């Protein structure tokens, strides 16, 4: 009997092999190409997590021989799932919803959805670091949705009708002072003015916008874009006083302001104290970018070296090219993979001619007749910070070399000027660089004084500063006697979306740019808009993770299944698990068609019960095991 079973098993295996050889070619992504794949470990059975499945049909479409059959209702259930893009956005912008509206051709409605959460949709459409895209489930199939570009597209199709639904409460008689007219301060001021408070923003510079105006070059964020948003903020009643430096928070309180928000940006740059750092030709990134933005005469040499591999470093490098530099290098301590700049910024910089030198430490600035001539460097194996926070660098002996330069720009960090809180014992700072606040309320230790933005976090994302401004506005409104409800409903009520077909393979479009030759001769914006057809097609790629079409029927025909696991790998929600003995069990049950009741995951069995550790240890190195722990109810 045993040999008979062995014979049946061998015959069955040969038939599966033959079936695989005869079936048509299939295009898929293997682990070497697809770094973030769903769990395909082999545990005890085939399991399907009903709570995680939204009925997107991805598994059925990925199956090469159509053994999965799904039936879902025509309309979705809304409100029980938060899409990853929505959940990841610091400001809580509902990206899934506005992307869906763009797919439906409702572009102005999409912009209204964005404006429900932020007063800077155009700014974010141009320069947002888009953490939402990093979490986009579509990226598990092919590529994430170009959410930032779609945000810009929506802004470009604004019809202004959202203003008719905007909130504007009657005057409260309360006065608020905002120190710093950057993204955090202006966001807070915008919402506080809508709550009826009299808001005055004090800006030490001659122009409004803070770091988004003087820290981000015009070719990335044209000034007219910022001006449009500032005009909207002024329209709701925010008064902005330029060229006004606040020396003391206490004085503002004595002048009759009921609450103060400290939202000064990180305008103070850092210079590494290297030998020779006092030579002519040394610049600081923040000063350099600010002077260029203010239209001051700024000269750079023919050869420029930027020390620092973050986005600011590449902003300096690309700005130097536009000012006439012939050779621009970015050198940094981090490895190429560990560089702090975004992949987009590095790619665009190199395309424009910036040379990148990662894994470098710096020993001294060389000079000739009082002017810089280069920077002496060492190649670096690795670096780390010890328990005291001191940098430990493992340099390669004998690797000394000089990067020639007429101008050296330090872009190695920046922090806020906090002289206005000096001597105030109630307001605590961290080494005089950032202000300690309550994380939720943004309140400092002094009654009536709040802080937000880079003054609290250090250099951070624009969207993070906007989110901090929202939080501060809520807390300050409550402090001033309001209810803290700054939410608005600006977009029309969305009709219940109907089900669409499962996703087909389609990659994100290339964002258009102006020609390279034109880029280097002007500060004109380099990135262009998506055309309407491309924008709609891109929005249609969205998996609509915030909508749940709970399957009424979900079955797997094991008579045809070839146990390839593509259904599991393709599921963007980790709703399927391949069991350790699933294939063997299917051999014994050739006529078995598994219904959803048969494969529904047993909540009593922990995720670890679905994989076999011995098999997991022997999986190829490129295979990723994602232990599918519950991350919280309602998260897709």
Where are these regions (language model features)?
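N-terminal Rossmann-like FAD-binding beta1-loop-alpha1 element of flavoenzymes
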Residues: 175-200, 313-321
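Feature captures the FAD/FMN-dependent oxidoreductase FAD-binding
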Residues: 109, 170, 175-179, 227-274, ...
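FAD-site-proximal beta/loop scaffold in flavoenzymes
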Residues: 280-301, 365, 385-459, 499
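Iron-sulfur cluster-binding cysteine motifs and their immediate structural context
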Residues: 18, 58-75, 83-107, 125-155, ...
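Mid-to-C-terminal Rossmann-like scaffold of FAD/NAD(P)H-dependent oxidoreductases
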Residues: 347-353, 361-373, 478-541, 547
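A conserved FAD-binding loop/helix module that cradles the flavin
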Residues: 316, 452-483
